[in-house]
Amino acid sequence: MAKLAVLLLLAVAASATVPAQGRDPPTQIKLIRGADASGVVGDSMECVYTVFIRTGSIWKAGTDANITLQLAAADGNGVGISDLPAWGGLMGQGHAYFERGNLDIFSGRGPCMAKPPCWMRLASDGTGAHHGWYCNYVEVTVTGPHKGCAQQLFTVEQWLATDAAPYQLEAVRDLCSGGGEGVAAA
């Protein structure tokens, strides 16, 4: 219950950054996978997404690369965030995201998904002096007006790197069905 209270406090703080002119700030979150009226509730930015990402504590686990996140429900509809720190980084001015041992927190508004996320694609663009990155997990919480609070933990425990196994710059986790027949990878 205390964790939910903290998440709601973070969500209120993130939504308080909307300019007084009534315009939404520029955002890096968008609909993915051909989201339609049945898969996404409205096209306004009414839901609040809070994302916790734990970087591994092993040697050279941190990265300077750009990290993107896609989330989808079992029906394949969802959202994609192209630059997590720019979209909703909450760690403060000058914080180095995705560094060894960090628990980085991001929160921002986005279109509401009709169903909770159960599929995730985490990707690195491989740029920067230290492109390799070891991610322990991604935890996502989604809530919105007249909606419950959906929470999903995606265990990653994988390098996103071209020089370490599995030699991929992305990790896909599909928890949509027990038989592994959930959302197809992008």
Q: Where is each model-derived feature located?
A:
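Regulatory, non-catalytic segments
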Residues: 2-186
